[in-house]
């Protein structure tokens, strides 16, 4: 019943992976998980705790004694999706506990759905468990349920998100994450490594490192070193790379020390992939966002990174139609894209978020203008993507297999994160492949966002 990615319907989402089947009479809980990968990790933690306490995990509404809805509250559209999911869970099951980012506004939820059993905010794991205990008392089997359990996973067996911190110290005017999740709170590096080691030992082939600001990891704890591991993103990346799995870094801000990561990518210790939220390119727009405004220096930094690691893939997200954005400022963004030649981009039309300081800015952009700019931005980025992928035809690339069916094997290259980037499809000679395999392919064809290829002959 969990959603991964967030645009999947709950009834189409993958089932949680469990270590043992439910037993007769065991109380069961369902989970609907909305929002970003960081919220998905929260859902996994909750389910793991419940599983260890003796609860079964139901993949459908009918089999659950109660349902937890882990909400997203970042944008108005996300709030609407969360309210819809809560309503569906109430209609299908009737016993619903709400948690997550939208839970920071309990009156907003109970005003729309007064019959929910409880509302808790983000990261309030104990309160969620208390609400479950009150609604569905646990009934553990002391010989099975309370043994140390492998964590419940809502992703396929071969990749896993690894959350290294909570919260954020940035004060971007369009964002309310610090209000919902607080300031940066890094995990001890040794705790992150212990989790990563367990994941790899259990068959995970790819670790996706996530947080609100991955490059700030350890700043709040003064980069403390404990048990042989230092809380700094460069040290952590090096340590993770030693485990032998693919390591992919998400949500990295372009601080100067990020350049220390690039040699690790050039040496193959971590994947040559950076997910960096640039958001815009015009300095005046960036200042109105309360973000770093050195777009020209960013281009120089990108060039320096690529000089060290030519295979580096850069992904980013942008906002168009931000309050006050002029046509000239938007054109600067398009020109910057031409120069930066980013491999993967996402783009959002600005919308007000309750509590965000950007709401009060003057000169909001009309909806039709935002839509037009979004269309032009996506056309530009599509052209760049298509040209970059065309250059990969006839190359040999290493890929990880995500799914296999009768028609094709769906894979990803090192340049593709799950759910948000493209795929490489093998539609012939894929019968012996299975999810999690890492194989070499020859690229035969390229599209706008995806590749097609065949297994490369063994040397």
Swiss-Prot record:
SUPFAM superfamilies: Radical SAM enzymes
HAMAP family in the record: MTTase_RimO (MF_01865)
Biological process annotations from GO: tRNA modification
Essential cofactor(s): [4Fe-4S] cluster
Record PROSITE patterns: MTTASE_N, RADICAL_SAM, TRAM
EC number(s) on file: 2.8.4.4
Domain Radical SAM core: 154-387
Cofactor note: Binds 2 [4Fe-4S] clusters. One cluster is coordinated with 3 cysteines and an exchangeable S-adenosyl-L-methionine.
Binding residues annotated for [4Fe-4S] cluster 2, in chain numbering: 168, 172, 175
Keyword 4Fe-4S: yes
Domain MTTase N-terminal: 27-137
Xref: CDD domains: Radical_SAM (cd01335)
Record carries keyword Hydrolase: no
A Pfam family annotated for this UniProt entry: TRAM_2
Protein name: Ribosomal protein uS12 methylthiotransferase RimO
Catalytic activity: L-aspartate(89)-[ribosomal protein uS12]-hydrogen + (sulfur carrier)-SH + AH2 + 2 S-adenosyl-L-methionine = 3-methylsulfanyl-L-aspartate(89)-[ribosomal protein uS12]-hydrogen + (sulfur carrier)-H + 5'-deoxyadenosine + L-methionine + A + S-adenosyl-L-homocysteine + 2 H(+)
UniProt-annotated location(s): Cytoplasm
NCBIfam families with a match to the protein in the record: 30S ribosomal protein S12 methylthiotransferase RimO, MiaB/RimO family radical SAM methylthiotransferase
Role according to the record: Catalyzes the methylthiolation of an aspartic acid residue of ribosomal protein uS12.
GO cellular component: cytosol
Membership in a protein family: Belongs to the methylthiotransferase family. RimO subfamily.
Molecular functions (GO terms): 4 iron, 4 sulfur cluster binding; aspartic acid methylthiotransferase activity; metal ion binding; protein methylthiotransferase activity
Ranges where the TRAM domain occurs: 390-457
Residues binding [4Fe-4S] cluster 1, per UniProt: 36, 72, 101
Originating species: Roseobacter denitrificans (strain ATCC 33942 / OCh 114)
